[in-house]
Amino acid sequence: FALNISVLRGALHRSILTSYLFCRIVDTVEDAAKLDPKIKIKLLMEFSRLIEDPGYRDKNLTAWVEECKTVDGSASDLELLHQTQRVFNVFDSLATNHQDQIIPSVSKMAKGMAFFQSRFQFGEITPLGNIQELEEYCYFVAGVVGEMLCNLFFQKLPHLSETARNTMRQNAVSFGLGLQMTNISKDIIADRDRGWSYIPKSIISEKGLTMDEFHSGISMDKNLQILESLLCKTNGHLDDALKFTLALPRTEIALRLFCIWPLWMAAKTVSVLHNNPDLLKSKAPVKISRSTVKRILLGTPFIAWSNNLLKVSFGNIIDDKVLQNSPVFDREGLMSRLERIPLDTVNSNM
């Protein structure tokens, strides 16, 4: 989101930038490849309390930042961890109605990450069991972001029609899930090297492969079939994300571009990944070209006002009939399952 945040202005820009930094902070803890999962869980659960309780934060934030010295990652991510107090200083200056949208989403993200870390087997590849678990994981790391953006947009658009609000509420989670599943699809090798497999074990088993056989590439044909099933589901979420975007007023060009840019790039990425064996052969990431990114950034502002032109443009990105036949997302089913996950009782002793 770093690129598209730049198109925003004013209070919304400040709030979304701050929330993005919070998400990067917890993501850095979750992604630390050398850090014991028990320590990750402790840091993540502690962060959720820091953002929920200002009084607790005043007394304990310095100690939390000190504990984060054990986290490994890129120099920029570790510097952000070190500057967590500055991010909270900016957060405290935001309007209360914006803070109220950020707190529950970031807290839920941290707790959800901790929950999945409690299942991590250090030193071996830990798979997700099925599509339902994949949806649950993606909700905590990205679906909550879609909900938060939706609620922040509502603060800026007090006169938005109830019809548009309902459309956005129904598709906000898919906005996040579509982008996250795109990342999962293109990062299979990198995630495997970190010890995680976000490709559900059930999908792999359906094709007659074990986890080890899938990751060894013993059958490229079956591996591509497995990837296609995930891309098909991803494309369904991206279609829902388009509905979310088109519900924004046509006059709110900046808000639309904020959604259009990552959505178009995700769809382009899915089209590149489609039937692409290079994804499963090399550690070098399969990604869209800089020229493609440039065309998206330069071309979409001219059509952002038109729902019809946006639909045509988006439809032209992925024209394969297999990927267009996506399963319907059971949002209510996901929400029902999420209610049964005991987030507040996750601890590092699990």
Regions found by a protein language model. Name each.
Residues 1-242, 246-249, 312-330, 336, ...:
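Acidic catalytic motifs of isoprenoid enzymes
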Residues 67, 264-267, 308:
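Enriched - but not universal
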Residues 152, 182-188, 265-277:
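Extended, well-ordered alpha-helical segments in internal regulatory regions
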Residues 235, 239-246, 250, 267, ...:
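Hydrophobic alpha-helix feature that most strongly marks membrane-spanning transmembrane helices
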Residues 253-264:
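Amphipathic alpha-helical protein-interaction segments enriched in hydrophobic
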Residues 273-350:
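Acidic, carboxylate-rich catalytic segments that either coordinate divalent cations
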